Amino acid sequence: MKQESTVDLLLDVDQRPSAGKGILLSFQHVFAMFGATILVPLILGMPVSVALFASGVGTLIYMIATGFRVPVYLGSSFAFITAMSLAMKEMGGDVSAAQTGVILTGFVYVLVAASVRFAGTKWIDKLLPPIIIGPMIIVIGLGLAGSAVTNAGLVADGNWKNALVAVVTFLIAAFINTKGKGFLRIIPFLFAIIGGYLFALALGLVDFTPVLQANWFEIPGFYLPFSTGGAFKQYDLYFGPETIAILPIAIVTISEHIGDHTVLSQICGRQFLKDPGLHRTLLGDGIATSVSAFLGGPANTTYGENTGVIGMTRIASVSVIRNAAFIAIALSFLGKFTALISTIPNAVLGGMSILLYGVIASNGLKVLIKERVDFGQMRNLIIASAMLVLGLGGAILKLGPVTLSGTALSAMTGIILNLILPYENKN
């Protein structure tokens, strides 16, 4: 099912480039996703190797679910950082709640996919209008602002070297985002991390011990929900309130999923939400997310960076994305490579996080502006105000065995208020 393309494609979805050209194009997609994909596990303290492996496997799962008809790459999701970090903190560093929560989020995707298949999409628009999505994104973005500032060393007892590295990293990312041209502008995270890392190295803040100790070939450091006799670390499937609090993030990520596929459809001149259909794209995304979390990785999501590469190169070949997934899987087994990534100082991550969390929050405002949410309507002011204060103010609501806080409480509050508050009659 086709529509008019906004880009004159050199290679369509079902076409393939020559072998040599194809490898170069695939590496270009790897570079595009790399900075963001490794940043999430670094912030969360997860093995980078698992995130790379899961992104590659997740992309292949997505392609199988969609019949290899959509050129989408799946990488680590920023949206879950706040909720997963809080779950780990509340569990004393144990990842059980965080991983179980993301596994269940994948199941939520599957349930929504089934509902879309049999009931259409109108109920999504009714349940999740922009007045809920916008404040939710703001809460997600600002929820970990304090940790970003701490990692950056911008605190009373902070080290000036760390603060300087964080500022330099932030400025590199900011200038690339505003002044970068072409492909450079698509990979600001990667260049900012490299620039910040080199600056930290010059200040003596990098320890290469992990690289020297690592083997050239290593199996990714999977975390699994069962015993492997010590071969891999273990977590438990945990279904407490810390786990349930992660599920509402799906509200935002499903909306992002729809938006990404809409943009990609316009670039490729296809209607991917109809063929293969939203139910199949959600199914692939959901299964990929559950598999990633099962292995000890972060949630997966569709990557706008790779959509940008398609728009820039005018090559929408699914085979190029598929091979990029295989490259990511191969990189996850290079022990010294993943060990080198683990030596990136917290100050670099802090500088990136300040920009990242701020951009996420600002995108929440962008949703409200783009969708022209009428704040002349008192009901909209009330919904947004309640969501922001409860989501960022540390509010906790205990309902029997279930405890709601942060993004979960914010989401539930917004949904309920949107359903019960009447619209004003301006006449």
Label for each model-derived stretch:
Residues M1-L24, F208-F232, Q266-L273, T281, ...:
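Intrinsically disordered, low-complexity non-transmembrane regions of multi-pass membrane transporters
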Residues M1-L74, F78-D94:
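N-terminal signal-anchor module of multipass membrane proteins
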Residues T6, F34-G35, T169-K179, I187, ...:
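Juxtamembrane interface elements at the cytosolic ends of transmembrane helices
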Residues L9-A19, G45-M63, A245-V318:
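Membrane-embedded helical hairpins/re-entrant loop segments and their flanking transmembrane helices
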Residues G20-A36, K161-T169, I187-P188, I219-D260, ...:
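Hydrophobic, membrane-embedded alpha-helices of multi-pass small-molecule transporters
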Residues I38-I43, Y73-L86, G259-C268, A299-M312, ...:
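Re-entrant/interfacial helical elements at transmembrane boundaries that shape
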Residues S85-M91, N177, N306-I321, I327-S332:
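Interfacial segments of multi-pass membrane proteins
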Residues D94-D207, N323-N427:
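Membrane-embedded alpha-helical modules
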